[in-house]
Regions:
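N-terminal basic, amphipathic alpha-helical segments
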Residues: 1-134, 330, 340-347, 355-358, ...
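Hydrophobic residues at beta-strand termini and immediately following loops
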Residues: 114, 180, 224, 309, ...
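General small-molecule cofactor/ligand-binding pocket signal
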Residues: 178, 220-224, 307, 397, ...
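Proline-centered loop/turn at the N-terminus of a beta-strand
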Residues: 199, 242, 277, 305-307, ...
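Walker B catalytic acidic pair
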Residues: 281-282
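Conserved core segment of the aminotransferase class I/II
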Residues: 302-372
């Protein structure tokens, strides 16, 4: 009987993950050609999943030519090694080999993918960015050939410091700013800097990758429950946490904006013991659509215990891997003393280009355009959803900050069944419960879905609304 582990399936639904697992086993020869697959009911019982999940997985495998159905008998594996079969199906040895590792990634064929954090082509300032790159090539030829300092090119760090002062009221020196290719890289540096003896915390529900980074670095961590106003401070004390990673401006995925009272409560917690720190992750704070930004923790911290982290991946595009962290003075001095042997992971060319883009005022203009763009996009999506029969079937939550909102669906289906049904219609969703670590708490978030809308086509929203309406 086929057996698979469903604990770490990422953003896939059960049916998609099951389909990928079976396909991989067929390609690698673990399931032999001509072998009969278990019946849908038997496999569902063995894996403790629904029959419809197995049915959808088998249907996808059959559609792609990996298995075939014999009436009143079941599903059998196609002989992929047979020359005749290869010619008829178009499968070459190269394709079979490349598929062995193709469990995730690649271009998807969804009509609407609400799990993607990519940026639409029309939202990126190509002409200005290209013009800036040309200017850098002409004006910085000597600088482009030099190795950058470990913390990054000083010109970009000064540009970021000026930007933070103007728009977040943060007074920082450029020497406190460390540039890196992605927050994952910067997080690994932080763990080395703060030490693995400290205990770190991960928000629950929260961003899965944070826990994976701590685990891969061998750091000790605990999950901290997120309340209606942010992390549970009493739990930080109970679990003897030293370092909390949080997103006060816009928690992902709940969308909670931490009120100023909770921010001061966290600052009170961090000052009570010596080896305590707050990592403030403001990954999409610039994209707050309504109201003025609430002050950052770093801007109201007087104890030097807040490490501020941000990225340009949300404001420019996901493939621009430029992030930065602002270290308190004491940690900055320790960084240069202990970790200055690390080379900056962002090229000089990218750093000077971004610095010039910011210094010219183009970044500020781009942010303003981007806010308007996403606000109009969000309004169009909500307009399509909140009319007709669908209006009584869903409830929209936390729609004012960032480029995602939550959607609660009134349905008799389980989450698994609803996700599979949507996937069969070309609509990819992620359940809020999938971001929760503890299975007994997931019921609280039943049938609430995280709707990332940065990469969806507004023209397809009427179709999406119609498909959701049809689900019982």
């Amino acid at each position: 009987m086929l057996t698979y582990n469903f604990e770490n399936i990422g953003s896939d639904t059960l049916y998609e993950y099951l389909y990928k697992c079976i396909k991989n086993d067929i390609i690698q020869g673990k399931i032999k050609s001509g072998e009969k697959l278990p019946s849908k009911r038997a496999l569902a019982k063995n894996l403790a999943i629904s029959v419809i999940t197995v049915e959808n997985a088998y249907g996808q495998l059959a559609a792609e030519g990996y298995i075939y159905s014999v009436p009143k008998s079941g599903f059998y594996v196609v002989d992929l090694r047979d020359d005749k079969m290869k010619n008829e199906s178009g499968l070459s040895e190269n394709r079979i080999y490349s598929n062995k590792l193709n469990l995730t990634g690649g271009k998807n064929g969804y009509i609407a993918d609400f799990t993607s954090n990519q940026t639409e082509q029309s939202a990126f300032p190509f002409s200005i960015w290209t013009k800036t790159m040309r200017a850098v090539m002409n004006d910085y030829q000597t600088e482009l050939m030099l190795n950058p300092p470990c913390g990054g090119v000083m010109e970009l760090r000064q540009s970021i410091a000026d930007y933070l002062k103007a728009f977040r009221n943060m007074t920082v020196r450029p020497e406190q700013i460390i540039i890196g290719a992605g927050t994952e890289y910067l997080s690994s540096l932080l763990i080395q800097l703060l030490g693995k003896k400290l205990k770190y915390s991960v928000e629950n529900p929260g961003y899965h990758k944070i826990a994976k980074i701590y685990r891969s670095m061998g750091a000790c961590y605990e999950y901290i429950e997120i309340e209606e106003d942010g992390p549970k401070v009493e739990e930080l004390e109970e679990k003897e946490i030293n370092v909390i990673h949080c997103s006060p401006s816009h928690h992902y995925p709940t969308g909670i904006v931490m009120p100023i009272s909770k921010r001061y409560e966290l600052l009170g917690w961090v000052t009570r013991k010596k080896d305590r720190y707050i990592i403030e992750d403001e990954y999409d704070s610039e994209l707050r659509l309504n109201g003025k930004p609430i002050p950052s923790l770093q801007s109201i911290d007087v104890s030097g215990k807040v490490i501020y982290m941000n990225t340009f991946s949300k404001t420019l595009c996901s493939t621009v891997r430029i992030s930065y962290m602002v270290l308190p003075d004491e940690l900055a001095e320790r960084f240069y003393r202990e970790l200055s042997f690390y080379s900056c992971t962002v090229s000089n060319f990218e750093q000077y280009t971004l610095a010039q883009f910011m210094n010219s005022g183009s970044f500020e203009k781009h942010i303003n355009r981007l806010r308007n763009y996403y606000q109009q996009k969000r309004d169009r999506i909500l307009e399509a959803f909140l009319q007709g029969a669908l209006k009584t079937k869903i409830k929209i939550l936390e729609e004012d900050a960032g480029v995602h909102f939550l959607m609660k669906v009134d349905t008799n289906l389980s989450e698994e069944e609803f996700l599979d049904k949507m996937k069969s219609k070309g609509i990819k969703l992620a359940a809020l419960s999938s971001y929760y670590h503890s299975s007994e708490k997931k019921k609280k978030y039943e049938n609430i879905y995280v709707m990332n809308y940065s990469f969806v086509d507004c023209e397809k929203m009427e179709y999406v609304a119609k498909m959701i309406t049809q689900v019982e």
